[in-house]
């Protein structure tokens, strides 16, 4: 049940990443308002997802009798701090149409970095970390 909730949030994040990609392809100038709306919606989904992991997932896995599970969980927690900073910087820099339009090239570069980082993290969580939920 817990795993399904996290995967549902992952799909929502990936859907928003794809939505932003399409908007960028359609033209930043004409899509800036929609881009900022998508970024702000994604920020909300990510904040809820991270809060749930912090409150439920990580404590569960850190209680595991398996030292490997505890070590991997700690590593994921540390990595999340770095990813959260990358995403927060992106969201703060591009959460309005005017910010996006004032630095279109920077927006595209930052979005590509964020998209890659989020997809990489989601893939790793689903193929490794979430498999430990039933073993914890």
Predicted regions and their residues:
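Small-residue-biased structural context
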Residues: 1-136
């Amino acid at each position: 049940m817990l795993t399904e909730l996290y995967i549902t949030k992952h799909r929502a994040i990936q859907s928003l990443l794809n939505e932003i990609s399409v908007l960028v392809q359609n033209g930043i100038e004409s899509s800036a308002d929609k881009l900022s709306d998508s970024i702000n919606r994604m920020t909300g989904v990510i904040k809820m997802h991270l809060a749930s992991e912090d409150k439920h997932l990580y404590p569960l896995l850190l209680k595991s009798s398996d030292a490997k599970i505890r070590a991997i969980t700690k590593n994921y927690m540390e990595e999340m701090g770095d990813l959260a900073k990358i995403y927060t910087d992106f969201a703060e820099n591009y959460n309005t149409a005017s910010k996006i339009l004032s630095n279109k090239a920077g927006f595209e570069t930052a979005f590509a970095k964020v998209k890659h980082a989020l997809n990489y993290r989601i893939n790793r969580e689903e193929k490794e970390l979430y498999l430990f939920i039933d073993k914890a």
